[in-house]
């Protein structure tokens, strides 16, 4: 076997391989012997068919199969010998085959980039320092009460957290526009559903009033014909409602799994959940900064085959989320996923190099801790932990999570990490 390797472009490689004629003939004869042992031909007992008849009847197909097998096996031998690491499936380009002559073919593929990590010491990471305070717990209890609130009619003027029912008609330069009209539209104030100025124009008015408000559509508004345009909305305010918050009774508290129905028990449960969310948020915030710094400091070429593979994964995930099937997934435009796919591949290659250079392996104690932390959010943590322990795929996924965390910690060990005090709400709003 003769082998030559050339670079086509960037990460592209072409391996050209020549297989000696006698190697081909030896393999063909060996395979014909195997075929002769199995075939049945009228007039002959099984395994007793003369080789010349076997060769005459099966020679062409056997030769084709042998060539395919030799191409594959010799390519594998070649890349092992040349220490080449292909990224993605190779493309075989067979040359012309002539009986009794050497056979030359080529294989085209991409290789993984050679990554030399740099700039880790210049990565800047700001670690949030946060404590869950009594005021934070109070705020979360208010949120829980608001989620369970009922609405009652209100005679007074509209305020920030009220709910209104309105008819409205929008116009630009005196002309109504598509999508600018609605009847019995229910709007919860303060949720940012409408364009800037719309809710402010309603505040202070009472049920039964009709009025006009002036607003300006944002420059980034999705409808091209409305971007940056001044508009008027004629409003008929039909109903104003205010929240009626439930009291923290034992019955209400038990809805959240606090069996003794006490306020103290609910506060303890809420605090525990908030601290778990906080731990995760801090970890994600630090991780995202470390990875962003790693990517900016290391500009690497990315094999197109890996991007294509990642696009297929993202397509299928998107189709599953919206109830689609395999065919519908492949019809989704690749442009929707290309940027995200490339970033995921880049991050994977860089973290892979961090893992390799630091000789990292998944810490089983960390894996156990991650599973326990995740399980603590469920009603029966022990059942969840047992379920994970018996599922190899889930355990492997969690080991990958742990290994990624360890890689990020290796980056942080060399990065410039500073601490910044912040509040629970500020951090959570940044995560949103």
From Swiss-Prot:
Its EC number is 5.2.1.8. Residues 161-246 form the PPIase FKBP-type domain. It comes from Escherichia coli O139:H28 (strain E24377A / ETEC). GO terms for cellular component: cytoplasm. The keyword ATP-binding does not apply. One of its GO terms (biological process) is cell division. PROSITE patterns: FKBP_PPIASE. One of its GO terms (molecular function) is protein folding chaperone. Keywords: Cell cycle, Cell division, Chaperone, Cytoplasm, Isomerase, Rotamase. It catalyses: [protein]-peptidylproline (omega=180) = [protein]-peptidylproline (omega=0). Pfam families: FKBP_C, Trigger_C, Trigger_N. Homodimer and monomer. In vivo most of the ribosomes are in complex with monomeric TF. Uncomplexed TF, however, is in a monomer-dimer equilibrium with approximately two thirds of TF existing in a dimeric state. This is Trigger factor. Consists of 3 domains; the N-terminus binds the ribosome, the middle domain has PPIase activity, while the C-terminus has intrinsic chaperone activity on its own.
């Amino acid at each position: 076997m003769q082998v030559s390797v050339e670079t086509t472009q960037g990460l592209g490689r072409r391996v050209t391989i020549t297989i000696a004629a006698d190697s081909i003939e030896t393999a063909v004869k060996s395979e014909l012997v195997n075929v002769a042992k199995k075939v049945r031909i009228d007039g002959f007992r099984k395994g007793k068919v003369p080789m010349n008849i076997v060769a005459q009847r099966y020679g062409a197909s056997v030769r084709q199969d042998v060539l395919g097998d030799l191409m594959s096996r010799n390519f594998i031998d070649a890349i092992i010998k040349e220490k080449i690491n292909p990224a993605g499936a190779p493309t075989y380009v067979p040359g012309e085959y002539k009986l009794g002559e050497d056979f030359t073919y080529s294989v085209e593929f991409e290789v993984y980039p050679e990554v030399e990590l740099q700039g880790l010491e210049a990565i800047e990471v700001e670690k949030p320092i946060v404590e869950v305070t009594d005021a934070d717990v109070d705020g979360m209890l208010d949120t829980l009460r608001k989620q369970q609130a009922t609405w009652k009619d209100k005679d007074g003027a509209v305020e920030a957290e009220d709910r209104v029912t309105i008819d409205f008609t929008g116009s630009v330069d005196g002309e109504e526009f598509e999508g600018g009209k609605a009847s019995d539209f229910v709007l919860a104030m303060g949720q940012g559903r409408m364009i800037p100025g719309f809710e402010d124009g309603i505040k202070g008015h009472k049920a039964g009033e009709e009025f006009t408000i002036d607003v300006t559509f944002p420059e980034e508004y999705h409808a091209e014909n409305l971007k940056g345009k001044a508009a008027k909305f004629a409003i008929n305010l039909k109903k104003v409602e205010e929240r009626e918050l439930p009291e923290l009774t034992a019955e209400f508290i038990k809805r959240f799994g606090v069996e003794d129905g006490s306020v103290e028990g609910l506060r303890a449960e809420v605090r525990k959940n908030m601290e778990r969310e906080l731990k995760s948020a801090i970890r994600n915030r630090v991780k995202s900064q470390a990875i962003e710094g790693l990517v900016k400091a290391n500009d690497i070429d990315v094999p197109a085959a890996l991007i294509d593979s990642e696009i297929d994964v993202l397509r299928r995930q998107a189709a599953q989320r919206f109830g689609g099937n395999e065919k519908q997934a492949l019809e989704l435009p690749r442009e929707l996923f290309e940027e995200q796919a490339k970033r995921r591949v880049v991050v994977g290659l860089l973290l892979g190099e961090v893992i390799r250079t630091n000789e990292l392996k998944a810490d089983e104690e960390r894996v156990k801790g991650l599973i326990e932390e995740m399980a603590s959010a469920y009603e029966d943590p022990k059942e969840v932990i047992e379920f994970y322990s018996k599922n190899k795929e889930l355990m492997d996924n969690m080991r990958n999570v742990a290994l990624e965390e360890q890689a990020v910690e290796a980056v942080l060990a060399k990065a410039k990490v500073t601490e910044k005090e912040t509040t629970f709400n500020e951090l959570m709003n940044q995560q949103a």
